[in-house]
Amino acid sequence: MIDTKVLRANFQEVKAKLIPKGEDLSDFDKFEELDEKRRELIGKVEELKGKRNEVSQQVAVLKREKKDADHIIKEMREVGEEIKKLDEELRTVETTLETILLSIPNIPHDSVPVGETEDDNIEIRKWGEAPAFSYEPKPHWDIADHLNILDFERASKVTGSRFVFYKGLGARLERALYNFMLDLHVDEYDYTEVIPPYMVNRTSMTGTGQLPKFEEDAFKIREEDYFLIPTAEVPITNMHRDEILSGENLPINYAAFSACFRSEAGSAGRDTRGLIRQHQFNKVELVKFVKPEDSYEELEKLTNQAERVLQLLELPYRVMSMCTGDLGFTAAKKYDIEVWIPSQDTYREISSCSNFEAFQARRANIRFRREAKGKPEHVHTLNGSGLAVGRTVAAILENYQQEDGSVIIPKVLRPYMGNKEVIKP
């Protein structure tokens, strides 16, 4: 949620900054009109309450003097009814304003490149060289089928499309990856490890910005107002909802492994094979709560920490700065880390690292005090994938594939896999 003080003081300027995000702003102009109506209603209610207090005092005087006060009591009741009617109107206006505020996207940071689509994203840096093959590189689903380590067909029978069974060394590779990722972030970068709930309530989904806008993308539990988490960002950020943190403890860094669940409502026909776009997948998520003045430095740190996973795995990648039109609803600035996928001859997203500034903190009411008796301020929140595990499996299978159908295990993972060096047919 953006700062209402900023919105009221700079309405047209804020609108001009939001337009390049390409989000639906159809309700945006209504805010100014309704906000003015809200102020008018508050003024009327306060005026009538003042009048009611005066009348109440007059009634008290008349009663002490044993005089007739019926006509004044009637007037007081009429004023009370008018106040009740205006209060109801005010609640309706405030509810509508709250709905509009929840639909307004975050304001892009001035450093974000202006553009409409992913074609306008800016490459920041590349790392590593794409492997050279003397043959046509195979897609990871064919490699996995040959090695008997992933089973999409049986998962489709058991559940449906966009699900998978990991088995044998495939399951062990997945487990090795998330253990390696967690060890790196916890041991080297001092993150606190968390295992979160996989279901959250509506308030939590609203706090991080998934609701109300993206409800169709979420899996909802019948007869309960619970949702399966699309990312561990949701429960981890909401750990501190409605709390005031001590500034001495910031930054707070969490690393969480979880399954993630997404309906992929708008992805029909895209990435229908393989691990790139699944309804259920595992991910290691990094979440930060920081002081406002530190958040952009922390974004660079966060991105570098996610990159380090790929560097240690020796997987080629690039870092992209997302343009305004590809920034998404909640982020003020976002980097995508994209790993090389040989069979597609392109880079694919494997991590998004975002600074939300105070956008999520306002929605979730997360604040901090610089001093024990200081005025509470909203924290800035950040999160990034460190990394999406299934996509990392896909990248390893494709980049480390051999002509005989085997796959070399990255050196850094071998201690997690019984010192095996290769996955053979």
UniProtKB/Swiss-Prot annotation:
CDD domains: SerRS_core. The keyword Aminoacyl-tRNA synthetase applies. Its EC number is 6.1.1.11. It catalyses: tRNA(Ser) + L-serine + ATP = L-seryl-tRNA(Ser) + AMP + diphosphate + H(+); tRNA(Sec) + L-serine + ATP = L-seryl-tRNA(Sec) + AMP + diphosphate + H(+). One of its GO terms (cellular component) is cytoplasm. It is an enzyme of class 6 (ligase). One of its GO terms (molecular function) is catalytic activity, acting on a protein. Signal peptide: none annotated. Gene3D superfamilies: Bira Bifunctional Protein, Domain 2, Serine-tRNA synthetase, tRNA binding domain. Keywords: Aminoacyl-tRNA synthetase, ATP-binding, Cytoplasm, Ligase, Nucleotide-binding, Protein biosynthesis. The keyword Metal-binding does not apply. Belongs to the class-II aminoacyl-tRNA synthetase family. Type-1 seryl-tRNA synthetase subfamily. Catalyzes the attachment of serine to tRNA(Ser). Is also able to aminoacylate tRNA(Sec) with serine, to form the misacylated tRNA L-seryl-tRNA(Sec), which will be further converted into selenocysteinyl-tRNA(Sec). Consists of two distinct domains, a catalytic core and a N-terminal extension that is involved in tRNA binding. Homodimer. The tRNA molecule binds across the dimer. This is Serine--tRNA ligase. It comes from Bacillus velezensis (strain DSM 23117 / BGSC 10A6 / LMG 26770 / FZB42) (Bacillus amyloliquefaciens subsp. plantarum).
